[in-house]
Amino acid sequence: MYNLTRLSNKKLTIRINIVTVTFIIVIIMVIYSLLLKQCRLSSDSSNNSQLKKQKYRLLILILTAPDNMKERVTLRKTWLSDKSDNVKHLFVIGTENLQLENHETLQSEQLKFKDLLLLPKLRDAYGTLTKKVLQSFKRIIDEYDFDYLLKVDDDSFVLIHKLLVNLDTWEAKGYRKELYWGFFNGKAQVKRHGAWKESEWNLCDYYLPYAVGGGYVLSYNLVKYIAMNADNLRLFNSEDVSVGLWLSAVANIERRHDIRFDTEYRSRGCSNDYLITHKQSPDSMKALHDYYTATGNLCSKEFSNRMSYHYNWTVPPSQCCVRKPGII
């Protein structure tokens, strides 16, 4: 009888131990599960923080060619050196079919300056400029947050701080429209010959009103609209003409023609009122920057090469743009 009682107590002890061990294992598993979940949440939070887009007041896209190292160096040393932290610039370059040596040079430049937007699926050429702009818009919408975009060429000189002041003034007036700002042309005849010929243009005898390509500003939502509809847009040889066409049917836009944008295919001269002046060589870029830094004026002597115009939005585009003396 004693042995049976002893055996029964022993079995009970074993059962209690099994229950205790099982309970401990369950507790450990619950704690481990909670810790794992916390780690995942922490990791997700860290990843989300890393993926958060940097916000800029102004994002500057500068179209440049792979071999235009001198132009990029000049811009970094001149007007880009004056930009504030809320301004981001990117040199846009297509890298498809580049020779290995060119790739290595660009990679070295990227490591040093971290300001290249490289497009691996774009062959960099005059005939692909519109694709270049379109692919750039898609990339920056994915990777950056910004209020306004300035698109310029690598031979354009820009007074960034004056652009920013003008943007602040425009917003302070309470406008609720999207901004398309530049030097507009509404009566440019369709090119049928040469590098910029448009064999596919069949909309009308003239290009639709557009801001010429030496420099123009778009508000964020317009860039996003183009990027989101990229697969459905018609592409023409001239990127500035294409942008004007893409935005032609969009409502709630202020098309702001500004004679302070010297952004046509050749410069109109030099004026201390200019915000952007196009077709500048590296040497003239340095001279403009040095003189502006020393005096606060862009020109040592103001002059005009050709007449300008105020855009008349009340008449048909073919009558919009009458050049007159006395306009910068």
PLM regions and their residue ranges:
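Secretory-pathway lumenal glyco-enzymes, predominantly type II signal-anchor Golgi glycosyltransferases
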Residues: 2-328
